[in-house]
Amino acid sequence: MAKAVTVKIKLVSTADTGYFYVTKKNSRTQTEKLSFKKYDPVARKHVEFKEAKIK
């Protein structure tokens, strides 16, 4: 059986609120860590979210 190309990752808020998004990424084409500006409802503003592993 082949190894899965897409991997589930967690985008964690840099505002230290504990809020996170779960998304998928293609590990072959996107080798660098993802970083997005998304809405954090706990902080009630747009902040940067950085990639972390799902445990």
Curated annotation (Swiss-Prot):
Entry coiled-coil feature ranges: none
One GO location term (cellular component): cytosolic large ribosomal subunit
SUPFAM superfamilies: Zn-binding ribosomal proteins (SSF57829)
Transmembrane segments: none
Gene Ontology BP, a term: translation
PROSITE patterns xref list: RIBOSOMAL_L33
Signal peptide: none
Keyword tags: Ribonucleoprotein, Ribosomal protein
Pfam families tied to this protein: Ribosomal_L33 (PF00471)
InterPro entries: Ribosomal_bL33, Ribosomal_bL33_CS, Ribosomal_bL33_sf, Ribosomal_zn-bd
GO molecular function: structural constituent of ribosome
Top-level division of the source organism's lineage: Bacteria
PANTHER family linked to this entry: 54S RIBOSOMAL PROTEIN L39, MITOCHONDRIAL (PTHR15238), LARGE RIBOSOMAL SUBUNIT PROTEIN BL33M (PTHR15238:SF1)
Family label: Belongs to the bacterial ribosomal protein bL33 family.
Protein name stated in the entry: Large ribosomal subunit protein bL33
